Amino acid sequence: MTQARLHIVEFRGFEKFITGRAFWEVPVLVQRLCGICPISHHLAAGKAVDMLAGARVLTPTADKVRRLAHLGQTLQSHALHFFHLSSPDLLLGFDAEVGQRNLLGVLAAHPEVARRGIALRAYGQEVLRLLTGKRVHGVLVVPGGINQALGAAARATLQRDIDQIVTWSQDSVTLARELYLRDEARNQAFGSFRSSFLGLTRADGALELYDGGLRARDADGATIFDHVDPVEYTRYLREEVRSWTYLKFPYIVSRGRDAGWYRVGPLARVNNADVITTPLAEAERVRFRAHGGTTPVWASLAYHWARMIEMLHCAEAIRELLADADLGGSDLVVKGERQGTGIGVIEAPRGTLFHHYEADAQGLITRCNLIVSTTSNNQAMNTAVERVAAQYFDGRAITEGLLNHIEVAIRAYDPCLSCATHALGQMPLEVSALAPDGAVVDLVRRAADGTLTRPGATP
């Protein structure tokens, strides 16, 4: 085998949909990019709209309420991915029956784990409901601030269960670590490769999910750039278009198109951070990084372990933030002088998320550029598929085992492109094998119900 590609056939076109709309509408519109992490797009667009409104420095109440929403969003998304989507692979086995390899299968085989995952996600969703009015596609952000603070009753509701949420989150890190180390040799080799890593950090190098500067490190941990103001991202990052996929290929300018690709998300953030500011998550970060030795951790399946470390950090940070009186303040919005460009960058659950808008004098969007987390991980997913195919494809027939392993490799990156279609452990997938001359050697399709077909095969 000489090459493997992950073809993305879904076309969204949001960058064009947004053009011509009033800038203040954008934070609401872009939530429809994703049903699992809409608040991430809401907040990234909100930061860009703040800049358009000339209000980059928010009031303490607006800043902290937005941060609380982001922590709740990340907690629920990480819980959803690990327990609903990935734990069936990890607990039941990569080759388990498709009808079993889902949350219901985990509930039958490991009921306490499944119930804990459901409760963790529900708590994160409750944070969002109390702040935005709805668990999905609620509204919090307005230009220069927020539309409501956190009320006393809502704060009390969230405080009631947070200690249990922290405990369950710590148990989840233990589970993820044990699952990874249970078959360490296989998990380290599975879809593993060297790469650079990109993400936001604080000025002191601490893990940062909402604000901070851009940091990129190479596969050996050496710094490529650091403390870069996100509004300057176009000087450091570019995107390449390739004819065979709708997803672009971002890369670090100084490294060039071929060598400049990078990974984002939990693995990148935990690798890049010098410290995590909450104590339990920091202890787990130290243990995780020790596993990598003198270099960052490269294995694709280590994303799950890093994801649970971040979930623990979110739970701890929510507990700390709920004690802050500023959450209930009344100073919600600041105003400034309108600008023509707005750029907002945050760490979405799946990785660094860029929203870039330009607006005319009437406040209508004239240009939009979005670099979503899945786009940044595009080359990484292609490389993971290539590694897995090289290991499990015999050069002749595509087996169900190969499909299962490709699915596991893609799922480690938690891509938005498939989040709606594999929620029950059933990812529609088509895998074709081509000869050097382009002739199709084999073609297998897995439908959403898990049914396998070979188009053109003799009955």
What are these regions (language model features)?
Residues 1-352, 372-459:
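Active-site bordering "gate/hinge" segments
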Residues 360:
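Short, acidic, Ser/Thr-enriched surface-loop or helix-capping motifs
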Residues 350, 355-357, 367:
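A translation/RNA-centric and nucleic-acid-associated enzymatic feature enriched
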Residues 366-368, 372:
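Active-site/pore-lining binding-face segments in mid-to-C-terminal subdomains
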Residues 363:
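Active-site catalytic microenvironments in core metabolic enzymes, especially phosphate/sugar-handling
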